[in-house]
UniProtKB/Swiss-Prot annotation:
Cofactor(s) of this protein: [4Fe-4S] cluster
Protein name in the entry: NAD(P)H-quinone oxidoreductase subunit I, chloroplastic
Source taxon at top rank: Eukaryota
The reaction(s) this protein catalyses: a plastoquinone + NADH + (n+1) H(+)(in) = a plastoquinol + NAD(+) + n H(+)(out); a plastoquinone + NADPH + (n+1) H(+)(in) = a plastoquinol + NADP(+) + n H(+)(out)
Quaternary context: NDH is composed of at least 16 different subunits, 5 of which are encoded in the nucleus.
C-alpha cells in the first residue's frame, strides 16, 4: 500500500511540474504579442540597407587603368580584365571588363584594393533570373547605377524595423 501512495505522490508532483513548465512557456508566448512583426511583405516593402552593405559592384570604365589588382586580390580570380598594351604611350588600354555575379561571393576585396576607386558596392541585391548566364555583367551593365530603394516610389520602405531602431538608439 505504501509504494502505491508514493507513486501517486510522485505522479502528482510530476503533473504540477509539467503544468508549471507549460505555464512558463505560455507566458513567454504572451510576452511576444506586444512586439512588432519582424517579417515584411517583400516585393511591396523593403528594408533600407546599411551604408556598408555589399551589393552589386558598380564599375567606372574611364577610371580603370587595367592594373588587374582586383583579379589578384579576388579569392576566386573572378573579374575578367581584357586589355591591350599601347606601345606608343606605354600604357594599358582597357578593352573589356566583366564579373559573373553567379560566382561572386561579394567579399569586397576588389573594391577595397582598387587603386583608382573605379569599383564600388551598391545597395542592389536583386539578381533573380531564370538563366545563370544573365548574371555575367560586362562593363556596360556594371556601369549602370541602380535605383535607390529610398527613391523608388513603387515600394514602401520600412524605417521602423528592429535593425534601424538599434542603429538609432545604440544605448537602449
Amino acid at each position: 500500500m505504501l509504494p502505491m501512495i508514493t507513486g501517486f505522490m510522485n505522479y502528482g508532483q510530476q503533473t504540477l511540474r509539467a503544468a508549471r513548465y507549460i505555464g512558463q512557456g505560455f507566458m513567454i508566448t504572451l510576452s511576444h504579442t506586444n512586439r512588432l512583426p519582424v517579417t515584411i511583405q517583400y516585393p511591396y516593402e523593403k528594408l533600407i540597407t546599411s551604408e556598408r552593405f555589399r551589393g552589386r559592384i558598380h564599375f567606372e570604365f574611364d577610371k580603370c587603368i587595367a592594373c588587374e589588382v582586383c583579379v589578384r586580390v579576388c579569392p576566386i580570380d573572378l573579374p575578367v580584365v581584357d586589355w591591350k598594351l599601347e606601345t606608343n604611350i606605354r600604357k594599358k588600354r582597357l578593352l573589356n571588363y566583366s564579373i559573373d555575379f553567379g560566382i561572386c561571393i561579394f567579399c569586397g576585396n576588389c573594391v577595397e584594393y582598387c587603386p583608382t576607386n573605379c569599383l564600388s558596392m551598391t545597395e542592389e541585391y536583386e539578381f533573380s533570373t531564370y538563366d545563370r548566364h544573365e548574371l555575367n555583367y560586362n562593363q556596360i551593365a556594371l556601369g549602370r547605377l541602380p535605383m535607390s530603394v529610398i527613391d523608388d516610389y513603387t515600394i514602401r520602405t520600412i524605417l521602423n524595423s528592429p535593425q534601424t531602431k538599434n542603429e538609432v538608439n545604440p544605448l537602449i
